[in-house]
From Swiss-Prot:
Alphabetized GO MF terms: calmodulin binding; DNA binding
Source organism phylogeny: Eukaryota, Viridiplantae, Streptophyta, Embryophyta, Tracheophyta
IQ domain ranges (all copies): 798-827, 855-884, 878-907
UniProt family annotation: Belongs to the CAMTA family.
GO BP annotation list: regulation of DNA-templated transcription
Listed Gly residues bias regions: 328-338
Record's protein name: Calmodulin-binding transcription activator 4
Pfam families found in the cross-reference section: Ank_2, CG-1, IQ, TIG
Subcellular localization: Nucleus
Primary location recorded for the protein, binned into one broad class: nucleus
Amino acid sequence: MSSVAEDNSFTCDIATIFVAICRNPPANPSDSLFQYEISTLYQEAHSRWLKPPEVLFILQNHESLTLTNTAPQRPTSGSLLLFNKRVLKFFRKDGHQWRRKRDGRAIAEAHERLKVGNAEALNCYYAHGEQDPTFRRRIYWMLDPEYEHIVLVHYRDVSEREEGQQTGGQVYQFAPILSTQNVSYNQYIGDSSDIYQQSSTSPGVAEVNSNLEGSASSSEFGQALKMLKEQLSIGDEHVNSVDPHYIQPESLDSLQFLEYSDIDHLAQPTTVYQRPENNKLERCYGGNFGAQYSAKNDSNKLERCYGGYVGGAEYHSSNLMLVKNGSGPSGGTGGSGDQGSESWKDVLEACEASIPLNSEGSTPSSAKGLLAGLQEDSNWSYSNQVDQSTFLLPQDLGSFQLPASYSALVAPENNGEYCGMMEDGMKIGLPFEQEMRVTGAHNQKFTIQDISPDWGYANETTKVIIIGSFLCDPTESTWSCMFGNAQVPFEIIKEGVIRCEAPQCGPGKVNLCITSGDGLLCSEIREFEYREKPDTCCPKCSEPQTSDMSTSPNELILLVRFVQTLLSDRSSERKSNLESGNDKLLTKLKADDDQWRHVIGTIIDGSASSTSTVDWLLQELLKDKLDTWLSSRSCDEDYITCSLSKQEQGIIHMVAGLGFEWAFYPILAHGVNVDFRDIKGWSALHWAAQFGSEKMVAALIASGASAGAVTDPSRQDPNGKTAASIAASNGHKGLAGYLSEVALTNHLSSLTLEETENSKDTAQVQTEKTLNSISEQSPSGNEDQVSLKDTLAAVRNAAQAAARIQAAFRAHSFRKRKQREAALVACLQEYGMYCEDIEGISAMSKLTFGKGRNYNSAALSIQKNFRGYKDRKCFLELRQKVVKIQAHVRGYQIRKNYKVICWAVRILDKVVLRWRRKGVGLRGFRQDVESTEDSEDEDILKVFRKQKVDVAVNEAFSRVLSMSNSPEARQQYHRVLKRYCQTKAELGKTETLVGEDDDGLFDIADMEYDTLFSLP
């Protein structure tokens, strides 16, 4: 009994000392019971945040450390830097992108004053990465004015597990036990928080508050001592008098977990409990364990997650303890390896015996590996006996409950399913620690009301609409939607409605929630299901696409008769006699009864396809609608001018682009110009050339469309584009060659030619050379003979047209120059001067004569008074003297100014030209006489010919020449040429062909002196 009393009194003394230290902590770490190792702190800075006492110790001992004189550039995680703010002002410019305030200027740094003991000692500023929210920065300096210029900066990349533990709202921890040997300062001084520790010789409870206020009265201190004595008593009657679940919560920034390696062992076991109103026990061994307890028949359950999930195992607090081996005295029984191995076997057997009861006979395969890993990696073991430095699990947890949002995920009845899901290796399921972090958020910023759809196929992205309401300003941070552990951004469609895309994932159910940019939970958790996409779709979707003959002949016949009934309107037949000739033109193009019977017959015979039949019916419907539209806009008996507005005349461009040849002629009949241009200068021929409509191009050329028309200049095409260049850029080489040939021949026909025999011979020689080179390169196949013949004829026409156009411009320039020279020679022989000089003299004489009469008007008025001979003679003498005096005055003034000018020129010559530039100056200067002969390069017509005519002609001829090298282009040219001849015949404008074998081309060689010809 005496030994027990001594132990009891010794424990009370320890508690008294502990409370006294809490009331009056040391002023700085140098006065504490433990001195920190700087090298150890630098190593631990890579894996955890430093505690306020450790930071204070580094700042106070900065003189023995090296200060950084330059700002770092993108320091890595774990960097610990010391700065002097007075020397390096911009130490925050470290190259990283930090989250900024709403204005985007200043960095959004959170500020907090940290306590060492119960006194504020440090300033701390927190910053989060903009692109990587897990990368953090903390800046510390002391509140002491003497040391406030010394700054400690700590960079860390927080892992998901650590971030979840630190951002989960109120976090609870195991408090380390108090030892009588080698107690460090940071083991009993909290970081501006409360740490409660308990110690007893029996399964009792001890509680100590380390954050007692300095202004507490003596009565409070007495009550604390009284409670401490009761809790440290030996008897078991005081066990139930103390709250068995109490543990102090700590805030995010002040939470610091003590190292288990610094805890010494006591002779008696120790137990730590939580507060009942929180009903949650988390955090054991460095954050790798998550524990959950519930009471059933006075038994305790421990559900743990360490690289996996173990659920359903029942443990009794009377025979299960968590022991750390090797950290206390060697004489402890709990530290022996034999008993430790035996205890692991006992725990494994208990786990295997109890798991089937709670998981319906399924034993997790990771249980043995979990326990073996714990024993190998961490020196922690399970023992069946009471040993020193142990944590006992509580015996009475009947009131322990989980939050509603958490119980839905890890409730005891769902443990088996969740364990199986984790064992199957789900890619998107949340691990246990992440669930603890997500569900532990206390700041809800969004309320989910509905999710549509709430499922999607596993291997496809699904667009998901979430309806809810924001409980804060949506613009205050970046938001994301989390599907399991996959985080995707979303967009706010309108207030309370957001949209995102569910990522691809394996089949199964995952958690869906709204998170902020740093991964914090901001809403309740819903489920989203991923389903396997079935191989067979619905019957309608599985049907093959409609083939060319998918519609039955009976259905096609019914469709044809239905359209025929709609188009055979009796009222329109009654008004046919009132229609004009232009309206009857489109009516003639419509199908008659014979055509309808022919279409029905082809359907019955099976020779008509459904696609062609439907297209023909659509064309007939469009014909009827176009007839109605043109009739409504036609004027009564007035077809001289166009009856359509400028906007309505643009229909010709639509028709040309679509290739509706049947609609082209009725539109022309209503007065629309064939070369009508749109806002960009495009005509119908440009639109038809862009889409490669061969029939429409032939119809436009036959109707007189200009093949050389150029579009309006633009940034992309400063010189504009012709229809041939548009066709060539879209890959229609045959069409481009045909249009180029037509443009060249039309250009040649618009010129008035007076060719000589020499120019004709030159064009003929050039044409023969081109044709010979093409004939040598072209194949001699029979199927390509017809198209090759047409192509050679096109090249011949284009080559002769290009040569004759260029020769015509050269001849025109030559004639103009000769005419000018002949006129100059004629004038020089007759008058001794050129015509230009004569015209200038005559103009000056007129001006001089007029001015002279004005100047002599005063003299004439004077002469009227001196009509006598003597008076007139005196006047003339006086005037002569006055003129002489004026001449002398003017000469004197000119000579005076001339001297000044000569003086200035001499100064300029000597100072600038000779001395400064080291030249000869004006000595020996002779002005060059400008040549009056006009050079040929200054001829405006020649410049125009070089810039416009020659370039356009060469490009057109190159297109025709390149057409001959492609068989497809030759075939296309042959089709367009043949269609042109047919169109001309249909319009009654056929032209005389050269011979029966000729395919409608005129031979330019046979048109020697024609001043005007039109050749398409």
